[in-house]
Regions:
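Hydrophobic H-region at the start of alpha-helical membrane spans
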Residues: 11-20, 307-311, 353-355, 397-401
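Juxtamembrane interface at the cytosolic side of transmembrane helices
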Residues: 311-353
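Short, Lys/Arg-rich N-terminal segment immediately upstream of the first membrane anchor
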Residues: 1-10, 297, 338-345, 432-434
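Alpha-helical transmembrane segments of integral membrane proteins
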Residues: 352-615
Length: 615
Protein backbone atom coordinates (compact mmCIF):
# COMPACT_ATOMS: atom_id res chain seq x y z
CA UNK A 1 0.00 0.00 0.00
CA UNK A 2 2.82 2.41 0.85
CA UNK A 3 4.50 1.71 -2.51
CA UNK A 4 1.21 2.34 -4.32
CA UNK A 5 0.76 5.63 -2.44
CA UNK A 6 4.28 6.74 -3.37
CA UNK A 7 3.61 5.90 -7.02
CA UNK A 8 0.46 8.01 -6.99
CA UNK A 9 2.37 10.90 -5.45
CA UNK A 10 5.06 10.53 -8.10
CA UNK A 11 2.47 10.60 -10.89
CA UNK A 12 0.89 13.76 -9.46
CA UNK A 13 4.33 15.36 -9.19
CA UNK A 14 5.10 14.29 -12.76
CA UNK A 15 1.98 16.03 -14.04
CA UNK A 16 2.80 19.17 -12.05
CA UNK A 17 6.30 19.21 -13.58
CA UNK A 18 4.97 18.76 -17.12
CA UNK A 19 2.38 21.49 -16.59
CA UNK A 20 5.08 23.86 -15.35
CA UNK A 21 7.19 23.12 -18.43
CA UNK A 22 4.20 23.70 -20.71
CA UNK A 23 2.98 26.85 -18.98
CA UNK A 24 6.49 28.28 -18.69
CA UNK A 25 7.29 27.61 -22.34
CA UNK A 26 3.98 29.06 -23.50
CA UNK A 27 4.40 32.20 -21.39
CA UNK A 28 7.97 32.70 -22.63
CA UNK A 29 6.88 32.23 -26.24
CA UNK A 30 3.95 34.63 -25.95
CA UNK A 31 6.14 37.37 -24.52
CA UNK A 32 9.03 36.71 -26.90
CA UNK A 33 6.67 37.00 -29.88
CA UNK A 34 4.73 39.92 -28.36
CA UNK A 35 1.66 37.68 -28.31
CA UNK A 36 2.05 36.57 -31.91
CA UNK A 37 3.04 39.94 -33.38
CA UNK A 38 6.75 39.09 -33.77
CA UNK A 39 8.11 36.26 -35.89
CA UNK A 40 11.18 34.82 -34.12
CA UNK A 41 13.40 32.83 -36.47
CA UNK A 42 16.33 30.59 -35.53
CA UNK A 43 18.78 31.23 -38.36
CA UNK A 44 22.24 30.30 -39.57
CA UNK A 45 24.37 32.19 -42.08
CA UNK A 46 27.92 31.87 -43.37
CA UNK A 47 30.40 34.52 -42.29
CA UNK A 48 34.10 35.14 -42.76
CA UNK A 49 36.21 32.15 -43.79
CA UNK A 50 33.15 29.91 -43.96
CA UNK A 51 32.31 30.33 -40.28
CA UNK A 52 28.70 29.34 -39.64
CA UNK A 53 27.02 31.96 -37.47
CA UNK A 54 23.91 31.49 -35.37
CA UNK A 55 21.31 34.10 -34.45
CA UNK A 56 17.70 34.74 -33.55
CA UNK A 57 15.99 37.12 -35.95
CA UNK A 58 13.00 39.06 -34.60
CA UNK A 59 10.72 40.32 -37.39
CA UNK A 60 7.69 42.47 -36.46
CA UNK A 61 4.36 42.02 -38.22
CA UNK A 62 3.97 44.04 -41.39
CA UNK A 63 7.67 44.26 -42.15
CA UNK A 64 8.42 43.29 -45.76
CA UNK A 65 10.84 44.25 -48.51
CA UNK A 66 8.28 46.87 -49.52
CA UNK A 67 7.88 48.17 -45.99
CA UNK A 68 11.35 47.79 -44.42
CA UNK A 69 11.90 48.63 -40.77
CA UNK A 70 14.87 49.96 -38.80
CA UNK A 71 17.22 47.20 -37.66
CA UNK A 72 19.30 46.60 -34.56
CA UNK A 73 22.18 44.17 -34.10
CA UNK A 74 22.34 42.86 -30.51
CA UNK A 75 25.40 40.95 -29.29
CA UNK A 76 25.95 39.30 -25.91
CA UNK A 77 29.07 39.22 -23.76
CA UNK A 78 31.69 36.60 -22.94
CA UNK A 79 30.43 33.07 -22.11
CA UNK A 80 26.85 34.14 -22.82
CA UNK A 81 24.65 33.45 -25.85
CA UNK A 82 22.05 35.06 -28.09
CA UNK A 83 19.21 34.25 -25.67
CA UNK A 84 20.71 36.55 -23.07
CA UNK A 85 20.01 39.47 -25.38
CA UNK A 86 16.33 38.55 -25.22
CA UNK A 87 15.37 41.50 -23.04
CA UNK A 88 16.73 43.98 -25.59
CA UNK A 89 15.40 42.01 -28.56
CA UNK A 90 11.88 41.76 -27.14
CA UNK A 91 11.61 45.44 -26.26
CA UNK A 92 13.07 46.66 -29.54
CA UNK A 93 11.10 44.29 -31.78
CA UNK A 94 7.79 45.17 -30.13
CA UNK A 95 8.62 48.77 -31.02
CA UNK A 96 8.92 47.87 -34.69
CA UNK A 97 12.65 47.17 -35.07
CA UNK A 98 14.02 44.12 -36.86
CA UNK A 99 16.47 42.64 -34.34
CA UNK A 100 19.33 40.24 -34.99
CA UNK A 101 20.45 38.67 -31.68
CA UNK A 102 23.77 37.07 -32.63
CA UNK A 103 25.81 34.26 -31.12
CA UNK A 104 29.42 35.44 -31.13
CA UNK A 105 32.00 33.10 -32.64
CA UNK A 106 32.61 30.20 -30.27
CA UNK A 107 29.41 30.94 -28.36
CA UNK A 108 26.03 29.28 -28.55
CA UNK A 109 25.63 27.60 -31.93
CA UNK A 110 28.16 29.73 -33.84
CA UNK A 111 31.32 27.97 -34.98
CA UNK A 112 34.41 28.19 -32.75
CA UNK A 113 36.84 29.49 -31.83
CA UNK A 114 35.82 32.42 -29.69
CA UNK A 115 37.43 35.78 -30.54
CA UNK A 116 37.71 34.82 -34.24
CA UNK A 117 36.57 37.20 -36.98
CA UNK A 118 36.26 40.17 -34.61
CA UNK A 119 33.88 38.11 -32.45
CA UNK A 120 31.50 37.85 -35.42
CA UNK A 121 30.35 41.45 -35.13
CA UNK A 122 31.37 42.47 -38.65
CA UNK A 123 29.60 39.45 -40.14
CA UNK A 124 26.53 40.17 -38.03
CA UNK A 125 26.21 43.74 -39.27
CA UNK A 126 26.88 42.65 -42.85
CA UNK A 127 24.11 40.07 -42.61
CA UNK A 128 21.66 42.53 -41.08
CA UNK A 129 22.42 45.03 -43.83
CA UNK A 130 21.84 42.33 -46.47
CA UNK A 131 18.22 41.83 -45.42
CA UNK A 132 15.78 43.58 -47.73
CA UNK A 133 13.33 43.96 -44.85
CA UNK A 134 15.76 46.30 -43.06
CA UNK A 135 16.00 50.04 -43.68
CA UNK A 136 19.74 50.37 -44.26
CA UNK A 137 19.67 54.05 -43.34
CA UNK A 138 18.33 53.24 -39.88
CA UNK A 139 20.50 50.60 -38.28
CA UNK A 140 21.63 50.53 -34.68
CA UNK A 141 23.90 48.23 -32.71
CA UNK A 142 23.88 47.20 -29.06
CA UNK A 143 26.56 45.10 -27.39
CA UNK A 144 27.07 43.94 -23.83
CA UNK A 145 30.62 43.56 -22.50
CA UNK A 146 32.61 41.67 -25.16
CA UNK A 147 29.64 42.18 -27.46
CA UNK A 148 30.48 45.88 -27.28
CA UNK A 149 33.89 45.12 -28.72
CA UNK A 150 32.20 43.11 -31.48
CA UNK A 151 30.03 46.04 -32.54
CA UNK A 152 33.05 48.34 -32.18
CA UNK A 153 34.83 46.33 -34.86
CA UNK A 154 31.69 46.40 -37.00
CA UNK A 155 31.42 50.18 -36.61
CA UNK A 156 35.03 50.54 -37.68
CA UNK A 157 34.51 48.52 -40.88
CA UNK A 158 31.07 49.92 -41.74
CA UNK A 159 31.75 53.51 -40.75
CA UNK A 160 28.57 54.73 -42.45
CA UNK A 161 26.71 51.43 -42.24
CA UNK A 162 24.92 52.20 -38.99
CA UNK A 163 23.35 55.24 -37.38
CA UNK A 164 23.82 54.74 -33.64
CA UNK A 165 25.03 52.27 -31.05
CA UNK A 166 24.78 51.39 -27.37
CA UNK A 167 27.63 49.98 -25.31
CA UNK A 168 26.26 48.06 -22.32
CA UNK A 169 29.05 47.57 -19.78
CA UNK A 170 31.65 47.92 -22.51
CA UNK A 171 34.17 50.35 -23.94
CA UNK A 172 36.26 51.35 -26.93
CA UNK A 173 39.99 51.57 -27.51
CA UNK A 174 42.87 49.24 -26.85
CA UNK A 175 40.78 46.11 -26.31
CA UNK A 176 41.28 43.25 -28.79
CA UNK A 177 42.01 45.75 -31.54
CA UNK A 178 38.92 47.92 -31.07
CA UNK A 179 39.90 51.46 -32.13
CA UNK A 180 39.93 54.24 -29.57
CA UNK A 181 36.84 56.39 -29.65
CA UNK A 182 36.70 60.15 -29.98
CA UNK A 183 34.09 62.88 -30.28
CA UNK A 184 33.00 61.71 -33.75
CA UNK A 185 33.48 57.92 -33.72
CA UNK A 186 31.51 55.77 -33.15
CA UNK A 187 28.39 57.49 -34.42
CA UNK A 188 25.75 58.52 -31.88
CA UNK A 189 27.02 56.54 -28.91
CA UNK A 190 25.25 55.79 -25.63
CA UNK A 191 27.44 54.28 -22.91
CA UNK A 192 25.37 52.36 -20.36
CA UNK A 193 27.76 51.56 -17.54
CA UNK A 194 26.58 49.99 -14.30
CA UNK A 195 26.95 51.81 -11.01
CA UNK A 196 28.66 48.69 -9.62
CA UNK A 197 30.32 47.35 -12.75
CA UNK A 198 33.13 44.91 -11.99
CA UNK A 199 35.10 45.64 -15.19
CA UNK A 200 35.68 49.40 -15.05
CA UNK A 201 39.44 49.27 -15.56
CA UNK A 202 39.12 46.74 -18.39
CA UNK A 203 36.50 48.73 -20.26
CA UNK A 204 37.64 52.33 -19.72
CA UNK A 205 40.97 52.31 -17.88
CA UNK A 206 44.04 53.76 -19.56
CA UNK A 207 46.39 51.36 -21.33
CA UNK A 208 48.91 54.14 -21.96
CA UNK A 209 51.59 54.29 -19.24
CA UNK A 210 52.45 57.81 -20.40
CA UNK A 211 48.87 58.96 -19.85
CA UNK A 212 47.56 57.19 -16.74
CA UNK A 213 44.12 57.87 -15.36
CA UNK A 214 44.01 60.42 -12.53
CA UNK A 215 41.84 58.11 -10.41
CA UNK A 216 41.61 54.45 -9.36
CA UNK A 217 39.82 52.78 -12.27
CA UNK A 218 38.84 49.69 -10.29
CA UNK A 219 36.19 51.94 -8.69
CA UNK A 220 33.15 52.17 -11.02
CA UNK A 221 32.12 55.69 -9.98
CA UNK A 222 35.49 56.94 -11.23
CA UNK A 223 34.61 56.08 -14.82
CA UNK A 224 33.43 59.67 -15.34
CA UNK A 225 37.07 60.76 -14.91
CA UNK A 226 38.56 58.11 -17.21
CA UNK A 227 40.83 59.55 -19.89
CA UNK A 228 39.40 57.29 -22.59
CA UNK A 229 35.80 58.11 -21.72
CA UNK A 230 36.48 61.86 -21.66
CA UNK A 231 38.17 61.58 -25.06
CA UNK A 232 35.16 59.62 -26.30
CA UNK A 233 32.88 62.45 -25.19
CA UNK A 234 35.16 65.21 -26.46
CA UNK A 235 35.64 66.82 -23.08
CA UNK A 236 38.44 67.42 -20.60
CA UNK A 237 36.01 67.60 -17.68
CA UNK A 238 34.36 64.69 -15.84
CA UNK A 239 31.59 63.24 -18.00
CA UNK A 240 28.14 64.23 -16.75
CA UNK A 241 25.74 61.33 -16.30
CA UNK A 242 22.58 61.70 -18.39
CA UNK A 243 23.76 64.72 -20.38
CA UNK A 244 23.65 64.44 -24.18
CA UNK A 245 26.89 65.72 -25.73
CA UNK A 246 27.28 66.54 -29.42
CA UNK A 247 24.54 66.34 -32.06
CA UNK A 248 22.30 63.43 -33.05
CA UNK A 249 21.80 64.98 -36.49
CA UNK A 250 25.58 65.13 -37.03
CA UNK A 251 26.12 61.63 -35.64
CA UNK A 252 28.27 62.92 -32.78
CA UNK A 253 25.81 62.53 -29.89
CA UNK A 254 27.08 60.93 -26.68
CA UNK A 255 25.38 60.00 -23.44
CA UNK A 256 26.50 58.22 -20.26
CA UNK A 257 23.89 56.32 -18.24
CA UNK A 258 24.74 54.52 -14.97
CA UNK A 259 21.90 52.31 -13.68
CA UNK A 260 22.21 50.79 -10.18
CA UNK A 261 23.17 47.25 -11.16
CA UNK A 262 26.19 44.94 -11.56
CA UNK A 263 27.83 43.95 -14.85
CA UNK A 264 26.34 40.44 -15.31
CA UNK A 265 22.86 41.81 -14.60
CA UNK A 266 23.00 44.38 -17.41
CA UNK A 267 20.83 42.06 -19.49
CA UNK A 268 18.26 41.71 -16.70
CA UNK A 269 17.62 45.26 -15.56
CA UNK A 270 14.86 47.62 -16.64
CA UNK A 271 17.25 50.58 -16.40
CA UNK A 272 19.84 49.17 -18.79
CA UNK A 273 17.22 47.90 -21.23
CA UNK A 274 15.27 51.14 -21.01
CA UNK A 275 18.39 53.22 -21.70
CA UNK A 276 19.04 51.28 -24.92
CA UNK A 277 15.43 51.58 -26.05
CA UNK A 278 15.38 55.29 -25.29
CA UNK A 279 18.59 55.89 -27.24
CA UNK A 280 17.41 54.08 -30.35
CA UNK A 281 14.10 55.93 -30.21
CA UNK A 282 16.07 59.17 -30.18
CA UNK A 283 18.53 58.23 -32.93
CA UNK A 284 16.65 55.91 -35.31
CA UNK A 285 13.44 56.66 -37.19
CA UNK A 286 10.60 54.34 -38.07
CA UNK A 287 10.01 52.62 -34.73
CA UNK A 288 6.96 52.86 -32.50
CA UNK A 289 7.20 55.43 -29.74
CA UNK A 290 6.29 53.17 -26.83
CA UNK A 291 7.74 54.64 -23.60
CA UNK A 292 11.07 53.06 -22.66
CA UNK A 293 9.70 52.32 -19.20
CA UNK A 294 6.99 50.06 -20.69
CA UNK A 295 8.71 46.66 -20.62
CA UNK A 296 7.41 43.09 -20.77
CA UNK A 297 10.62 41.06 -21.14
CA UNK A 298 10.55 40.14 -17.43
CA UNK A 299 7.67 37.78 -18.14
CA UNK A 300 9.70 35.86 -20.68
CA UNK A 301 12.36 35.31 -18.02
CA UNK A 302 9.69 34.22 -15.56
CA UNK A 303 8.37 31.80 -18.18
CA UNK A 304 11.73 30.16 -18.82
CA UNK A 305 12.34 30.03 -15.05
CA UNK A 306 9.02 28.23 -14.55
CA UNK A 307 9.98 25.76 -17.28
CA UNK A 308 13.41 25.28 -15.69
CA UNK A 309 11.82 24.57 -12.31
CA UNK A 310 9.49 22.12 -14.05
CA UNK A 311 12.39 20.23 -15.61
CA UNK A 312 14.26 19.98 -12.29
CA UNK A 313 11.06 18.87 -10.53
CA UNK A 314 10.54 16.26 -13.25
CA UNK A 315 13.73 14.44 -12.23
CA UNK A 316 12.25 13.22 -8.95
CA UNK A 317 9.01 11.52 -10.09
CA UNK A 318 10.67 10.12 -13.20
CA UNK A 319 13.38 8.51 -11.08
CA UNK A 320 10.86 7.22 -8.57
CA UNK A 321 8.57 5.74 -11.23
CA UNK A 322 11.45 4.11 -13.09
CA UNK A 323 12.69 2.43 -9.92
CA UNK A 324 9.23 1.27 -8.86
CA UNK A 325 7.85 0.36 -12.28
CA UNK A 326 10.78 -0.97 -14.29
CA UNK A 327 12.07 -4.34 -13.12
CA UNK A 328 15.60 -3.64 -14.31
CA UNK A 329 15.94 -0.75 -11.84
CA UNK A 330 13.88 -2.08 -8.91
CA UNK A 331 16.82 -3.52 -7.02
CA UNK A 332 18.34 -0.05 -6.73
CA UNK A 333 15.65 0.95 -4.23
CA UNK A 334 17.14 0.57 -0.77
CA UNK A 335 17.02 2.22 2.62
CA UNK A 336 20.14 4.23 3.52
CA UNK A 337 22.32 3.20 6.41
CA UNK A 338 21.47 4.94 9.66
CA UNK A 339 23.09 8.37 9.92
CA UNK A 340 25.91 8.88 12.32
CA UNK A 341 24.60 9.86 15.74
CA UNK A 342 25.97 13.20 16.93
CA UNK A 343 26.69 12.61 20.60
CA UNK A 344 27.27 15.43 23.03
CA UNK A 345 29.03 18.74 22.54
CA UNK A 346 32.16 17.02 21.22
CA UNK A 347 30.13 15.36 18.49
CA UNK A 348 28.52 18.64 17.49
CA UNK A 349 31.87 20.43 17.45
CA UNK A 350 33.29 17.71 15.22
CA UNK A 351 30.31 17.96 12.84
CA UNK A 352 30.49 21.76 12.74
CA UNK A 353 34.21 21.64 11.95
CA UNK A 354 33.41 19.27 9.11
CA UNK A 355 30.60 21.56 7.93
CA UNK A 356 32.91 24.58 7.90
CA UNK A 357 35.50 22.65 5.90
CA UNK A 358 32.87 21.24 3.52
CA UNK A 359 31.33 24.66 2.87
CA UNK A 360 34.51 26.71 3.10
CA UNK A 361 37.21 24.85 1.19
CA UNK A 362 35.63 25.05 -2.31
CA UNK A 363 34.97 28.79 -1.99
CA UNK A 364 38.28 29.56 -0.27
CA UNK A 365 40.32 27.99 -3.05
CA UNK A 366 37.98 28.86 -5.93
CA UNK A 367 39.85 31.88 -7.27
CA UNK A 368 43.27 30.33 -6.71
CA UNK A 369 42.57 26.89 -8.18
CA UNK A 370 40.76 28.22 -11.24
CA UNK A 371 43.73 30.52 -11.81
CA UNK A 372 46.10 27.55 -11.80
CA UNK A 373 44.73 26.55 -15.19
CA UNK A 374 46.64 29.51 -16.61
CA UNK A 375 49.75 28.91 -14.50
CA UNK A 376 49.84 25.24 -15.46
CA UNK A 377 49.04 26.03 -19.11
CA UNK A 378 45.88 23.94 -19.00
CA UNK A 379 44.65 25.76 -22.07
CA UNK A 380 41.76 24.96 -24.37
CA UNK A 381 42.56 22.02 -26.64
CA UNK A 382 40.85 19.62 -29.01
CA UNK A 383 39.97 17.31 -26.11
CA UNK A 384 39.02 20.03 -23.63
CA UNK A 385 38.13 23.02 -25.85
CA UNK A 386 36.42 25.35 -23.35
CA UNK A 387 38.76 27.61 -21.41
CA UNK A 388 36.47 28.51 -18.51
CA UNK A 389 35.16 24.95 -18.24
CA UNK A 390 38.79 23.84 -17.99
CA UNK A 391 39.30 26.21 -15.08
CA UNK A 392 36.21 24.87 -13.34
CA UNK A 393 37.23 21.27 -14.04
CA UNK A 394 40.69 21.80 -12.55
CA UNK A 395 39.14 23.47 -9.52
CA UNK A 396 36.66 20.64 -8.83
CA UNK A 397 39.31 17.95 -9.34
CA UNK A 398 41.65 19.62 -6.85
CA UNK A 399 38.78 20.16 -4.40
CA UNK A 400 37.78 16.54 -4.92
CA UNK A 401 41.30 15.37 -4.08
CA UNK A 402 41.34 17.48 -0.90
CA UNK A 403 37.86 16.29 0.06
CA UNK A 404 38.78 12.64 -0.45
CA UNK A 405 41.91 13.08 1.65
CA UNK A 406 39.97 14.72 4.49
CA UNK A 407 37.27 12.06 4.31
CA UNK A 408 39.82 9.26 4.60
CA UNK A 409 41.51 11.06 7.50
CA UNK A 410 38.16 11.41 9.26
CA UNK A 411 37.27 7.78 8.58
CA UNK A 412 40.50 6.32 9.98
CA UNK A 413 40.63 8.64 12.99
CA UNK A 414 36.97 8.90 14.01
CA UNK A 415 34.88 6.30 12.16
CA UNK A 416 37.11 3.32 11.40
CA UNK A 417 34.35 0.84 12.28
CA UNK A 418 32.20 1.98 9.34
CA UNK A 419 32.21 -0.06 6.13
CA UNK A 420 31.96 0.99 2.49
CA UNK A 421 28.32 -0.12 2.58
CA UNK A 422 27.66 2.28 5.47
CA UNK A 423 28.84 5.12 3.23
CA UNK A 424 26.67 4.06 0.30
CA UNK A 425 29.71 2.99 -1.70
CA UNK A 426 29.01 -0.74 -1.96
CA UNK A 427 26.34 -3.37 -1.52
CA UNK A 428 28.54 -5.83 0.39
CA UNK A 429 32.12 -6.53 1.38
CA UNK A 430 35.19 -7.23 -0.70
CA UNK A 431 35.80 -6.55 -4.37
CA UNK A 432 32.78 -8.52 -5.56
CA UNK A 433 30.61 -6.98 -2.89
CA UNK A 434 31.04 -3.53 -4.39
CA UNK A 435 28.14 -4.27 -6.74
CA UNK A 436 29.65 -3.34 -10.06
CA UNK A 437 26.51 -4.21 -12.02
CA UNK A 438 24.45 -2.10 -9.67
CA UNK A 439 26.82 0.81 -10.22
CA UNK A 440 26.30 0.34 -13.96
CA UNK A 441 22.53 0.20 -13.42
CA UNK A 442 22.80 3.39 -11.37
CA UNK A 443 24.46 5.12 -14.30
CA UNK A 444 21.85 3.80 -16.74
CA UNK A 445 19.07 5.01 -14.47
CA UNK A 446 20.68 8.46 -14.19
CA UNK A 447 21.17 8.53 -17.96
CA UNK A 448 17.52 7.61 -18.57
CA UNK A 449 16.28 10.32 -16.20
CA UNK A 450 18.54 12.94 -17.80
CA UNK A 451 17.47 11.86 -21.29
CA UNK A 452 13.78 12.22 -20.43
CA UNK A 453 14.48 15.68 -18.99
CA UNK A 454 16.37 16.55 -22.16
CA UNK A 455 13.43 15.44 -24.30
CA UNK A 456 11.17 17.94 -22.54
CA UNK A 457 13.68 20.68 -23.37
CA UNK A 458 14.05 19.57 -26.98
CA UNK A 459 10.28 19.55 -27.52
CA UNK A 460 9.85 22.90 -25.76
CA UNK A 461 12.69 24.48 -27.76
CA UNK A 462 11.24 23.20 -31.03
CA UNK A 463 7.71 24.32 -30.26
CA UNK A 464 8.28 27.56 -28.34
CA UNK A 465 11.78 28.59 -29.55
CA UNK A 466 12.88 29.01 -25.94
CA UNK A 467 15.13 26.99 -23.65
CA UNK A 468 15.15 26.45 -19.88
CA UNK A 469 16.99 29.31 -18.17
CA UNK A 470 17.05 32.12 -15.73
CA UNK A 471 19.67 34.84 -15.97
CA UNK A 472 23.01 32.98 -16.31
CA UNK A 473 21.73 29.49 -15.49
CA UNK A 474 20.78 27.74 -18.69
CA UNK A 475 19.96 24.34 -20.13
CA UNK A 476 20.19 24.49 -23.92
CA UNK A 477 19.60 21.87 -26.61
CA UNK A 478 22.91 20.25 -27.50
CA UNK A 479 24.11 20.18 -31.10
CA UNK A 480 26.64 17.64 -32.41
CA UNK A 481 29.66 19.79 -31.52
CA UNK A 482 28.56 20.41 -27.96
CA UNK A 483 27.66 16.76 -27.48
CA UNK A 484 31.28 15.87 -28.28
CA UNK A 485 32.42 18.51 -25.81
CA UNK A 486 29.95 17.20 -23.21
CA UNK A 487 31.45 13.70 -23.47
CA UNK A 488 34.98 15.07 -22.99
CA UNK A 489 34.15 16.71 -19.67
CA UNK A 490 31.69 14.14 -18.30
CA UNK A 491 34.17 11.72 -16.70
CA UNK A 492 36.16 14.36 -14.74
CA UNK A 493 32.99 15.98 -13.42
CA UNK A 494 31.47 12.58 -12.59
CA UNK A 495 34.57 11.69 -10.56
CA UNK A 496 34.20 14.90 -8.57
CA UNK A 497 30.51 14.41 -7.88
CA UNK A 498 31.07 10.84 -6.67
CA UNK A 499 33.58 12.20 -4.13
CA UNK A 500 31.24 15.06 -3.23
CA UNK A 501 28.37 12.63 -2.67
CA UNK A 502 30.59 10.44 -0.50
CA UNK A 503 31.52 13.37 1.72
CA UNK A 504 27.98 14.74 1.81
CA UNK A 505 26.24 11.47 2.71
CA UNK A 506 29.05 9.48 4.26
CA UNK A 507 30.45 12.11 6.59
CA UNK A 508 28.18 15.14 6.75
CA UNK A 509 24.77 13.46 6.86
CA UNK A 510 23.23 14.66 10.12
CA UNK A 511 21.17 12.43 12.37
CA UNK A 512 18.24 13.49 14.48
CA UNK A 513 17.65 12.45 18.06
CA UNK A 514 19.45 9.22 18.89
CA UNK A 515 20.87 9.05 15.38
CA UNK A 516 17.52 8.66 13.64
CA UNK A 517 16.91 10.07 10.18
CA UNK A 518 15.72 13.62 9.89
CA UNK A 519 13.14 14.43 7.22
CA UNK A 520 14.25 14.56 3.60
CA UNK A 521 13.24 18.22 3.42
CA UNK A 522 15.48 19.14 6.36
CA UNK A 523 18.35 17.15 4.92
CA UNK A 524 17.94 18.90 1.56
CA UNK A 525 17.99 22.29 3.28
CA UNK A 526 21.13 21.44 5.26
CA UNK A 527 22.89 20.26 2.11
CA UNK A 528 21.88 23.40 0.22
CA UNK A 529 23.46 25.49 2.97
CA UNK A 530 26.60 23.35 2.90
CA UNK A 531 26.87 23.73 -0.87
CA UNK A 532 26.29 27.48 -1.23
CA UNK A 533 27.18 29.20 2.04
CA UNK A 534 30.88 29.50 1.28
CA UNK A 535 30.17 31.15 -2.07
CA UNK A 536 27.69 33.58 -0.54
CA UNK A 537 30.42 34.61 1.89
CA UNK A 538 32.89 34.99 -0.99
CA UNK A 539 30.41 37.19 -2.88
CA UNK A 540 29.92 39.30 0.24
CA UNK A 541 33.70 39.71 0.60
CA UNK A 542 33.91 40.78 -3.03
CA UNK A 543 30.86 43.02 -3.29
CA UNK A 544 30.45 44.82 0.03
CA UNK A 545 33.42 47.12 -0.74
CA UNK A 546 32.21 47.58 -4.33
CA UNK A 547 28.65 48.53 -3.39
CA UNK A 548 30.02 50.76 -0.62
CA UNK A 549 31.77 52.91 -3.20
CA UNK A 550 35.07 51.08 -3.64
CA UNK A 551 36.17 48.16 -5.78
CA UNK A 552 35.97 44.39 -5.61
CA UNK A 553 38.20 43.05 -2.86
CA UNK A 554 39.99 40.96 -5.49
CA UNK A 555 39.53 43.34 -8.39
CA UNK A 556 41.59 41.28 -10.83
CA UNK A 557 39.21 38.33 -10.42
CA UNK A 558 36.08 40.00 -11.76
CA UNK A 559 35.45 37.43 -14.50
CA UNK A 560 35.59 34.35 -12.29
CA UNK A 561 33.60 36.19 -9.64
CA UNK A 562 30.78 36.58 -12.15
CA UNK A 563 30.88 32.83 -12.86
CA UNK A 564 29.80 32.26 -9.24
CA UNK A 565 26.32 33.54 -10.13
CA UNK A 566 25.98 30.50 -12.38
CA UNK A 567 27.44 28.09 -9.83
CA UNK A 568 25.19 28.92 -6.86
CA UNK A 569 21.86 27.86 -8.47
CA UNK A 570 23.60 24.80 -9.92
CA UNK A 571 24.77 23.82 -6.44
CA UNK A 572 21.22 24.16 -5.13
CA UNK A 573 20.13 21.69 -7.81
CA UNK A 574 23.06 19.44 -6.87
CA UNK A 575 21.99 19.37 -3.22
CA UNK A 576 18.34 18.61 -4.02
CA UNK A 577 18.99 15.88 -6.57
CA UNK A 578 21.83 14.27 -4.65
CA UNK A 579 19.90 14.11 -1.39
CA UNK A 580 16.72 12.73 -2.97
CA UNK A 581 18.36 9.87 -4.81
CA UNK A 582 20.58 8.96 -1.88
CA UNK A 583 17.49 8.64 0.29
CA UNK A 584 15.74 6.57 -2.39
CA UNK A 585 18.64 4.22 -3.18
CA UNK A 586 20.77 4.18 -0.05
CA UNK A 587 23.82 4.70 -2.26
CA UNK A 588 25.64 7.67 -3.73
CA UNK A 589 25.79 6.67 -7.37
CA UNK A 590 22.45 7.56 -8.97
CA UNK A 591 22.53 11.07 -7.54
CA UNK A 592 26.21 11.59 -8.36
CA UNK A 593 25.85 10.37 -11.93
CA UNK A 594 22.68 12.35 -12.53
CA UNK A 595 24.10 15.65 -11.31
CA UNK A 596 27.28 14.99 -13.31
CA UNK A 597 25.15 14.63 -16.44
CA UNK A 598 23.10 17.74 -15.65
CA UNK A 599 25.98 19.99 -14.63
CA UNK A 600 28.20 18.94 -17.53
CA UNK A 601 25.28 19.51 -19.90
CA UNK A 602 24.54 22.96 -18.49
CA UNK A 603 28.18 24.07 -18.47
CA UNK A 604 29.29 22.78 -21.86
CA UNK A 605 26.16 23.67 -23.83
CA UNK A 606 26.18 27.22 -22.51
CA UNK A 607 29.91 27.94 -22.23
CA UNK A 608 32.32 29.53 -24.67
CA UNK A 609 34.42 27.26 -26.91
CA UNK A 610 37.84 28.84 -27.20
CA UNK A 611 39.71 26.15 -29.14
CA UNK A 612 39.55 25.95 -32.92
CA UNK A 613 38.07 22.47 -33.31
CA UNK A 614 36.43 21.01 -36.39
CA UNK A 615 32.64 21.25 -36.23
Amino acid sequence: MQSESHSKQAIVLLWIALILILVGGLLANLVQTNFGKIDVRDIRFVGTNGTVMSALLYVPDGVTNKTPAPGVLCIHGYFNSREQQGSFAIELSRRGYVVLALDETGHGYSDPPAFANAFGGIDGLAYLRSLDIVDKNNIGMEGHSMGGWAIGHAANVFKDGYKSMVLEGSGTGGIFGVPAGDATWPRNLCVVFSKWDEFTSTMWGSFDPKNPDPVDMTVPSNVVNANRLKAQFGTTQPVEIGKIYGSIADGTARQLVMPPVIHPADMQHSGTVGAAVDWFQKTLTGGKQIPASSQIWHWKEIGTLIALIGMILLLFPVGSLLMSGVGFFKELQMTPAAPIAIQGSKGWILWLVGAVLFAGIPATFYLHFTGLATDWKFNASTLFPQGITNQLMLWVLLIGAISLGLFLLWHFVFNRQASAADYGLSWGTGFMGVGWMKILKSFLLALTIAFIAYLTLAVSAWFFKTDFRYWVVTFKPIDALHFRIFLSYLIPFAAFFVILSLAMHGQMRPGGKEGKEISMGKEMLINIVLMVLGFLVLLAIQYIPLISGGSLTYASESLLTCVIYQLIPIFVIVALVNTYFYRKTGHIYVGAFLIALLVTWSLTAGQVTTAAIIT
